[in-house]
């Protein structure tokens, strides 16, 4: 899970700057099901101005390319920020299909890993987002998530 030192450094800076974020996408799928290849770290952030300022400050400290960007860009619901190259690319999104950040934030899962806290979207919110997306890879992820959910339910019996 998140073996890249760059990913860990970025998430530690998000913690330092009190960024409200959730790991979504492939790394979240792996948290709830089985390992799979992912070309990036997908992060959903709250798009309020206070959080946008914190995101910008964390990215600046990280050394991210921010030419022609301001913190206001991170308040735009349709904005998408990308840095790096696969498999170490980071995608920062202000919205994902089928989910409101505030609702997902209330359901977040906190994972303690390698002396750091990582904030993940909940499995149920991830499933809801994958259902809303409809992309072919999301359909595959959705099947794996639902299978893992069924296995977890059996383990609880």
Residue ranges and their predicted role:
Residues 1-157:
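Compositionally biased terminal segments of proteins
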